């Protein structure tokens, strides 16, 4: 089974892990409802950039 020949230095380990961190989500205020939403995503009511792009779905459980 392969084993490392040398100990990995802290700086090399840190460079490898540099992309593992979590970044905060980009959040904006929705123009139509005033609620928070992720930027560059369609809101729950179907609006994107002030325009309706999706038609709203009916209430859950209605037949």
Swiss-Prot record:
GO terms for molecular function: structural constituent of ribosome. HAMAP family: Ribosomal_bL32. Belongs to the bacterial ribosomal protein bL32 family. Residues 1-26 are annotated as: Disordered. This is Large ribosomal subunit protein bL32. Keywords: Ribonucleoprotein, Ribosomal protein. The keyword Ribosomal protein applies. One of its GO terms (cellular component) is large ribosomal subunit.
